């Protein structure tokens, strides 16, 4: 379900651009991807949990907007990120 703070810190450390980075698009997309993957498993098991499904769709939309922003801003960083995360785009 929700990410633990330790797991979130690991993701931030892995994808950050500089030492104090917590809000770059790469970090935000990586954290959202981990949350989406976790929630996707929950929704797969609990098919009638429409409330969680709506939250999942909201997160996917937010990630899509961040990916679009990153692609417009810096295509090279965008391509590296989707390759590291294994996203289909």
Swiss-Prot record:
Q: Which UniProt keywords apply?
A: Ribonucleoprotein, Ribosomal protein, RNA-binding, rRNA-binding
Q: Name one GO biological process term.
A: translation
Whether Transcription counts among this entry's keywords is no
| Protein's UniProt keywords contain Disulfide bond | no
Q: Domain of life here?
A: Bacteria
Q: Which InterPro entries match?
A: Ribosomal_uS15, Ribosomal_uS15_bac-type, uS15_NS1_RNA-bd_sf
Recorded GO molecular functions are: rRNA binding; structural constituent of ribosome
- One Gene Ontology term, aspect cellular component: cytosolic small ribosomal subunit
Q: Which Pfam families match?
A: Ribosomal_S15
Q: How does it assemble?
A: Part of the 30S ribosomal subunit. Forms a bridge to the 50S subunit in the 70S ribosome, contacting the 23S rRNA.
> What is this protein's function per UniProt?
One of the primary rRNA binding proteins, it binds directly to 16S rRNA where it helps nucleate assembly of the platform of the 30S subunit by binding and bridging several RNA helices of the 16S rRNA. Forms an intersubunit bridge (bridge B4) with the 23S rRNA of the 50S subunit in the ribosome.
Family the UniProt entry places it in: Belongs to the universal ribosomal protein uS15 family.
Please report the name of this protein according to its UniProt entry.
Small ribosomal subunit protein uS15
Q: What is the organism of origin for this protein?
A: Listeria monocytogenes serovar 1/2a (strain ATCC BAA-679 / EGD-e)
